[in-house]
Amino acid sequence: MKFKYKNLILAAARLLAVCALLSGCDGSGAETTAPEMLETVPETTPETQAPAPSEYNIVSGKEGFFKIVRPEELDSTHIAVTTAVEIRKFIKERTGVSLGLGDDWIMPGTEHDPEAFEILVGPTDYKESLEVMSSISYGDYAIRAVGNKIVIFSYTDVGYEEALQKFSTIIRGGIDNSGGNMSLTLAAEKLNVVGTVEKMTASLPLYHDGKLTAVANAGDGAYCIVISDTTEAAYNSYLSALAADGYKTHCTNELAENLFATLYTSEYTVNAGFYKNSDEVRIVIEPFSEDTLPLAKTEIKSVTTPLLTMIGLDNLVSGEYQNNGLCLIYRLEDGSFVIVDGGHSEDATVSATDIINTIREQSKDYAKSDSEIRIAAWIITHPHSDHFGTFVKAYSQFTKFKVERVFANFWDEATFEGFKSAKDTFAPGKYTTYSQTPTIAAKLGAKYIVPHVGQVWWIGGTKFEFLYTLESFLPRTTPTFNTCSLIFRTVTTDKSGKDYTVMVTGDGTGYTMQIIADTFGKALKCDVVQLAHHGSITSGNSGGTQKAYELMKPSVLLWPVGDQHYSTVKEYTYNHVLYDSRNPNFAELYIAGWQGNTVTISLPYTLGTADRKVVVEP
């Protein structure tokens, strides 16, 4: 069984801080002890072929009797590997003896020697490691004596940090320097520790019949467990295991042979998905609240006809064109509105005014005052200032309306902090306001919603189906926030039962577009596409963007870009597949253009009936 894990940029720095703590002293020169941890000691030791000795002689005099082993497949930056290195370093500092350090590779057809004395760190392919791994939960770490092996393992990065602290404390207690002979002997009874470092993932049953790829922090208090090389049957068995643990099924969804389910208890909500194309399962667990459960389809009172409006955002600020940005407004059948992004921070007041004028005009037949206008959802695709800047800077202008929900799903704080200085794009402080999104939602009196892949939210008679969130990309990390941009589609059904589909791609990169193309295939077919990232660069994977567009084959293109920049991005060949002979459905293309421009189409839309308002650039 092979395992791979998320390589956090900050892991090395955090581990060094832990190591400083381990070898540090207090002001009096006395040794400091590791912090108290939540831990449990099993009543019995698992049965093994080689009974564990009562004690383990690690070092005697100048001789070491153990070798430290780490997984061969993990690179030197992985926290399991750095933990192995730090254990070796710590033992040498305390005893003067440097233990051997190697990996778990052996010739095919051979087996590891059960009689060899070894410290196994991380997900090695030793049976002793597998025994320990199968006996603990995803939120745990373990230090266990199994036969002649000492096994140290965790499913999470923080678990390795805790295990390193605990094992170092055990080592301190096993050092004897009396009689002039340095020795390190560890009692077996001390090597039977399980600690819980993450309560939610520790509560989950283990997944069988698959390979664990990652237990990754997904931000917003959620964790994502990724299982590869699995099957639909194993996925269904896991749902049954969740049910046996008390989880209730809230809803399920199927798209292109991919299966999704939302389950919950009074403590946690789980969103699980089986991905047919990649034979993967992704399990996202988060604290339970009613807001984690997607809205089901219900009967609504028909108040008006659905519309979709794109608002232009280009403007001159300090002599520079703003060019990009995204602002879409849905008017739904029940008379409520959904705003997607909103526009720049630099001219947020103007963008907010344009949004407000649009929703007032479109609701004048049924809303007598601003207090009667409902913004059922404000969806933030990602936290770049040309998309959610208006939301951050001008949200106070919307307190006069009833804002019910804010949707967002961003990187967690730790990952963001690690990337701020990774590239010029992430200059310190440039995008730190993204973390204000839940706070602003609260100020608007709105519920804060974190959507997940496969979820369907029914809002005002329209189906909002999420196809990509950052959890689709985990455990990989990326130095561009565009890779965490939401991708979703909306489906509006007319009275005859015909569906009309709009694809909203936000600032999706070529990598995210590749993921949805590989995952959903021909199911990406739609009627309208909002071009990804303004039709601009794909962050190094133009083929992924083109592949997705070839599957979408829309009739109508909404291009969220200013006229100045359009002359550049229209030359990018991956966009051509949307409107050249490779797309026989193409009929209409609309450029967002100058600030205040609008193009409005009905949903469903009849070609040639768009309502356009064009503001002349001053």
Provide a role label for each language-model segment:
Residues R405, E413-E465, R476-T480, I515, ...:
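Binuclear metal-ion centers of metallo-dependent hydrolases, dominated by the metallo-beta-lactamase
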Residues D26-S28:
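Bacterial signal peptide processing site
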Residues D291-I373, A442-K443, K447-K525, V599-P618:
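Core dinuclear metal-dependent hydrolase active-site scaffold
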Residues T213-Y275:
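A cross-family detector of function-defining hotspots
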Residues A50-V194:
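Solvent-exposed alpha-helical segments and adjacent loops
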Residues L21-G24:
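C-terminal motif of bacterial Sec signal peptides marking the signal peptidase cleavage site
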Residues G335, T349-A408, F520-S536, K553-L557:
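Active-site metal-binding motif and surrounding structural segment of the metallo-beta-lactamase
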Residues A50-R70, K190-V226, R282-L293:
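Compositionally biased P/S/T/G-rich terminal and signal peptide-adjacent segments
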